[in-house]
């Protein structure tokens, strides 16, 4: 489900903004997405390397439309695995984000716009890790990669490293640098227990259907990446703020 209790953009606002687009979200597309989510939830347990490859293909390529070097034309390459981030490894050495997203187009020196950190289902995203040279939580590790990618930029570049995406391959969190770590978009494929909400992305309700639509939409290439300027998701956040200010002004003008 989409949990917006700590989100920088609300589910209600997204429902209003995407109403027409959601009407065009056919039952066939929803059924295909639901099959993919169920297939992932029921997958055999793989070693870390194989799991990351399958995870990247299932979600980043097949669901969200990013292109990798092996299967996409040069101009459509938006995904680099093991992206180097100087100064953000254990002990202050060179680190590597599990995945970086951006309009790379075959250039490894292009600015990444999303830095991703993957963990397995046994990891707690906010828990300190027992790693040699660093005890940072997965969330801290991910945001450190974003910070490292921003280091040395002058804020006048066409794009910036805007986002951090951290996941245990069941829970997904998208952090916007300006509001991290307190605010983030959060989805879970499967609830941990009955106390974790009334439904999840595998449920058959209308609320679950809309959340599946949001899951496919919000993390997509079209929402998170930009050729120049702020990406569409950030422009939606700004629109939500503007609407809130307008409503507040109307309230005080009464």
Model-based region annotation:
Residues 3-4, 8-9, 13, 59-61, ...:
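N-terminal functional modules and adjacent low-complexity/disordered segments of proteins
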Residues 47-52, 56, 92-96, 134-141:
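Phosphate/oxyanion-binding active-site loops and adjacent basic polyanion-contact surfaces
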């Amino acid at each position: 489900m989409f949990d917006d209790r700590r989100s920088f953009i609300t589910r209600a606002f997204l429902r209003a903004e995407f109403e027409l687009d959601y009407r065009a979200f056919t039952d066939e597309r929803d059924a295909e997405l639901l099959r993919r989510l169920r297939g992932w939830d029921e997958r055999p347990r793989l070693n870390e390397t194989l799991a990351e490859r399958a995870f990247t293909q299932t979600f980043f390529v097949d669901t969200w439309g990013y292109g990798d070097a092996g299967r996409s034309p040069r101009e459509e390459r938006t995904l680099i695995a093991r992206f180097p981030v100087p100064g953000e490894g254990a002990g202050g050495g060179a680190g590597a984000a599990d995945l970086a997203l951006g309009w790379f187009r075959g250039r490894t020196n292009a600015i990444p716009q999303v830095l991703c950190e993957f963990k397995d289902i046994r990891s707690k995203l906010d828990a300190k890790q027992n790693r040699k040279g660093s005890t940072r939580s997965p969330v801290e590790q991910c945001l450190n990669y974003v910070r490292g990618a921003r280091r040395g930029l002058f804020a006048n570049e066409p794009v910036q490293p805007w986002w951090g995406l951290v996941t245990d391959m069941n829970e997904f969190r998208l952090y916007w640098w300006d509001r991290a770590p307190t605010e983030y978009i959060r989805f879970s494929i499967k609830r941990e227990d009955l106390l974790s909400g009334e439904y999840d992305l595998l449920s058959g309700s209308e609320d679950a259907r809309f959340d599946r639509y949001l899951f496919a939409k919000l993390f997509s290439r079209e929402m998170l990446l930009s050729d120049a300027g702020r990406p569409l998701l950030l422009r939606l956040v700004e629109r939500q703020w503007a609407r809130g200010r307008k409503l507040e002004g109307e309230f005080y003008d009464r």
